[in-house]
Amino acid sequence: MDLIRGVLLRLLLLASSLGPGAAPLRSALRKQGKVGPPLDIILDALNCSAFSIQWKMPRHPPSPIMGYTVFYSEVGIDKSLQERSYGVPPGLDTPTSGRLDHQMIFEEVIGDLKPGTEYRVSMAAYSQTGKGRLSSPQHVTTLPQDSCLPPTAPQQPHVIVVSDSEVALSWKPGESEGSSPIQYYSVEFTRPDFDKSWTSIREQIQMDSMVIKGLDPDTNYQFAVRAVNPHGSSPRSQPSSTIRTARPEESGSGRYGPHYATDTEAGEDDDTFEDDLDLDISFEEVKPLPAIKEGNKKFFVESKMAPRPNPMTVSRLVPPTPASLPTTAVAPQPTPVDRKGKHGVAVMPRLFDTSCDETVCSADSFCVSDYTWGGSRCHCNLGKGGESCSEDIVIQYPQFFGHSYVTFEPLKNSYQAFQITLEFRAEAEDGLLLYCGENEHGRGDFMSLAVIRRSLQFRFNCGTGVAIIVSETKIKLGGWHTVTLYRDGLNGLLQLNNGTPVTGQSQGQYSKITFRTPLYLGGAPSAYWLVRATGTNRGFQGCVQALTVNGKRLDLRPWPLGKALSGADVGECSSGICDEASCINGGTCMASKADSYICLCPLGFRGRHCEDAFTLTIPQFKESLRSYAATPWPLEPRHYLSFMEFEVTFRPDSEDGVLLYSYDTGSKDFLSINMAGGHVEFRFDCGSGTGVLRSEEPLTLGHWHELCVSRTAKNGILQVDKQKAVEGMAEGGFTQIKCNSDIFIGGVPNYDDVKKNSGILKPFSGSIQKIILNDRTIHVKHDFTWGVNVENAAHPCVGSPCAHGGSCRPRKEGYECDCPLGFEGLHCQKAITEAIEIPQFIGRSYLTYDNPDILKRVSGSRSNAFMRFKTTAKDGLLLWRGDSPMRPNSDFISLGLRDGALVFSYNLGSGVASIMVNGSFNDGRWHRVKAVRDGQSGKITVDDYGARTGKSPGMMRQLNINGALYVGGMKEIALHTNRQYMRGLVGCISHFTLSTDYHISLVEDAVDGKNINTCGAK
């Protein structure tokens, strides 16, 4: 604008200096008149600190337009003091005159304004005649501050080390994305041992996970993330945990791929500032950002099309203003090259005649130069597919189409030796299956596996010559094959389908291979350059079902769920496998392999299509069927906060798998019991750190084992069979565990959702016959509420061997029958025909009474009981009546033996009285015992021993009980007696009298009983 004013001033001075001869010039200037105001002015508030102004040039200007000026000031403030102006000089593409120039739309963005403030705006054009007429003032108000909030900080990023120079980074958005959707993320890093500030990677990352390359080997790093929306950047996230890149000898990795500038910055929370560092850092985005999935989001900040219907639009962007809004660039239409995948999904990359510098690919795709056909192609990112890469593809068994590939971290600890097993199905005679090497072009060290004319070729080079090992048999197209590669130094081996191994040897003396590139599966982005090394420049066509490297099976799903870091144009081999599945009775279909499925049958159904109904007795779990069962916690979570104990009897068929698992959705709390490498592991977390207890000895597979795990506060105990008990402690200061999920048995519904430190990797394979939680038995028939593909184990109890309503009690590989009253024998097959006058009890026997005349004599303010008994066991219950279920400080009355002594106990609601007569009353002889209570006072007399007395604490005097009366034992005795007694009487009872004169016929008056036989001699 100063330039324009200077030109006009010099013209006027020149005219005046010419004197009278200049009159015609001055007259000509006056005749031309002032330029009119710009037309069709539109104001629009963009954000809190900027507005846009659009206009058309004045109609029929008398002379060419030399520029525009926008005048703006706050409404309500003295205009002469506050008015500001912004000059718009003419650009190369700015029309200045012409018949159609008035149709052009101009746009400018005015920034650095106050939030929520009303501005008065007008503008004028400049020409040779000077400033034109001002437009009529218009008003515009910037958006209020609360509508222009930046995002909150993302969650703490999770980092895993990929190699000596690479890490994989993932994160989740923060609590709020601010007032507008997140546009991109920025990543920062620091080296705690060297740096005093954070270095920013100057890239706009439109993902929520990435692989960062080019880091220093054997170096500590921390990473942080910021989220950016149109209103600004979030604070820095909580820094990641400190990780250390691998040493070069541990893991080869190259600094490959595009490199990007870095920026060392000092933020609001930094104490120091350093100059930019010349760090060679690159990144690879591996997962699309959900907020920008649709359409082409490749942003161009150079221009912005005005949102007007007129096709002729000129636009500019003011660089300092943060209000610029990016637009979608339109890519040229590619040459149509179509190929349909196995299930009809278009997968052939689009071919362009232009180079990647000029090609604009759609969102979720990237450009690669095509050296074979010329031009370039847009490839879909891993997990994306379809014509415009807009379809989500869930990848479990990757499908390749000749131009696809998947990348994994470079081969680790493999420079001297490695073993790789691959299960695949080929659809074409040629194609690259595996490649990993020193560089992307096959020069120097490498290994590869390729299908060449239906033969498999395993090649490797230690640096001085290539070994080529060719399978003796050819593969069958469309059939599944398993190939194993093994190399140790110069020597290599290839084995196809368990056939005769073929061996070979590389040339020269070098025996180690440096691996720096990713491990490529199904092809490689540089396959064109690999033909000399690998024998083919074609990608693999077909499916891969399993890949195992050095004994560890790789999860082929995209990271972070699996190990696949990136890829191109990958499909899912099992897609559509369930379309024609017929799972009935509530079963659901899922792919079990690349070309087969299983039905997830609900509890009580089994079979290929869940067609077979059955009664579950002894559950059998199978990893191949994704089995699991679930049961709710018997009581509220508060009952298990500080103490829990599980007793489990199980038979493992595999060295790994989850036995029990439960967790809290709102915290880090969990507990898990796993088979891990043949050992039992008990893991638990109170919210501040995980405790891990591991059995000292491995378990014998195919045999029954007894397990007991307990936790008191943050202390745990693990006991397996007769092994030495293992004790351990959880980390941190928290001491309680709250689990609001069900208890999962034998597996879980989703292995991706388990707690990070739970150790849960796969389902349990084997049988579980008993689970007891805090003395409460978890019954398969009644307590298992849901689950899938749980079948019956091969166990005698499955065949219901107990007759006449007897219940089968499994005892590892054997069993016992609990017989109802009136039956006896190994299988309860024998009816008791004679009346039982003196019942015999076996430790798991009992008699139950619910007659009101009996019950009222064992309650109230007074009680009087007499019994004659004999026993050979030191411990056993004689009599019990209490609330059902028992609660803390519940009323009860009991009589029994503990370590040979007789104990009379009762609680009236204010505390327990326990009166004991010491002795050895388990001598097998008959003894008489009398227990009397009058209010709080109690007395017990045994044989001719002197009486022992006692008194209950507190003020309560009445015995208020709602439960039945049990003699000789009871159901779940440890649970219902709060562990006062662990077993019933082993012996006989001949007399039972209440209230001194109310004689009870022990068997005849009983309403129920178990395992009652006739005692021998009186």
From Swiss-Prot:
Residues 265-274 have a biased composition (Acidic residues). The gene is EGFLAM. Keywords: Cell projection, Disulfide bond, EGF-like domain, Extracellular matrix, Glycoprotein, Heparan sulfate, Proteoglycan, Repeat, Secreted, Signal, Synapse. Residues 231-244 have a biased composition (Polar residues). It is found in: Secreted, Extracellular space, Extracellular matrix; Synaptic cleft; Presynaptic active zone. The keyword Ligase does not apply. This is Pikachurin. GO terms for molecular function: calcium ion binding. Glycans are attached at N47. GO terms for cellular component: basement membrane; cell projection; presynaptic active zone; synaptic cleft. O-glycosylated; contains chondroitin sulfate and heparan sulfate. PANTHER family: PIKACHURIN, PIKACHURIN-LIKE PROTEIN. Disulfide bonds join C356-C367, C361-C378, C380-C389, C543-C573, C578-C589, C583-C599, C601-C610, C797-C808, C802-C817, C819-C828, C988-C1015. Residues 395-573, 618-797, 836-1015 form the Laminin G-like domain. The keyword Glycoprotein applies. SMART domains: EGF, EGF_CA, FN3, LamG. It comes from the Eukaryota. Interacts with DAG1 alpha-dystroglycan. Interacts with GPR158 and GPR179; transsynaptic interaction is required for synaptic organization of photoreceptor cells. Involved in both the retinal photoreceptor ribbon synapse formation and physiological functions of visual perception. Plays a key role in the synaptic organization of photoreceptors by mediating transsynaptic interaction between alpha-dystroglycan and GPR179 on the postsynaptic membrane. Necessary for proper bipolar dendritic tip apposition to the photoreceptor ribbon synapse. Promotes matrix assembly and cell adhesiveness. Residues 37-145, 153-248 form the Fibronectin type-III domain. Residues 1-23 form the signal peptide.
